[in-house]
Design a protein with these regions (language model features):
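Sequence-level detector for tyrosine residue identity
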Residues: 4, 22, 124-125, 151
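Short, hydrophobic/π-rich interface segment
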Residues: 101-146
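Beta-rich nucleic-acid/ligand-interaction surfaces
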Residues: 145-155
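N-terminal accessory segment detector
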Residues: 1-99
Length: 155
């Protein structure tokens, strides 16, 4: 079995450890993050897929995932927050520092993704940016990096 494959095939009700739901979920998140990083690095390192093609796939996935186009910046932010995997809710990774109908600014309090990418976490963030571009493509909002771990969604 390759590192990006999973052997878990049971129904969710059977797979969840009811006595330690938080720990079980945390393990699944780490498993998912690791498998994504392994898949992307394996495909691009072997030349099977170009990274630009993966960004296009991520963008198209984002476009297809939208069920309701956000009309306010807080709605756009919640679309991202509901779609992206940023740890457990208790981790409070995406901390809003400003919110108006036209703008949301937030900071990511920690980098939960970098550890899985063997020094190439920029790959994850480029794929995430492409996904977000797709998610916001039908709206009037754009994502802007403000430097560090601060981001802005605005018109």
């Amino acid at each position: 079995m390759k590192a990006y494959e999973t052997a878990e095939r049971r129904d969710l009700a059977e797979a969840v450890d009811g006595s330690n739901i938080h720990g079980w979920l945390q393990n699944r998140i780490h498993d998912s993050e690791g498998r994504l990083a392994d898949l992307v690095t394996t495909l691009t390192a072997t030349g099977t897929v170009r990274f630009a093609d993966l960004k296009e796939v991520a963008c198209n996935f984002g476009k297809a995932a939208v069920t309701e186009v956000p009309v306010t910046a807080p709605e756009a932010f919640h679309l991202l927050d509901d779609t992206l995997l940023n740890g457990m809710p208790c981790d409070q990774v995406m901390k809003v520092v400003e919110s108006t109908p036209d703008t949301v600014i937030w900071e990511e309090t920690q980098d939960l993704h970098g550890e899985f990418w063997n020094g190439k976490s920029d790959c994850y963030y480029k794929l995430r940016s492409a996904l977000i571009k797709g998610l916001l493509s039908g709206s009037t909002f754009k994502l802007k990096s403000l430097g560090g771990r601060q981001y802005e969604i605005s018109k």
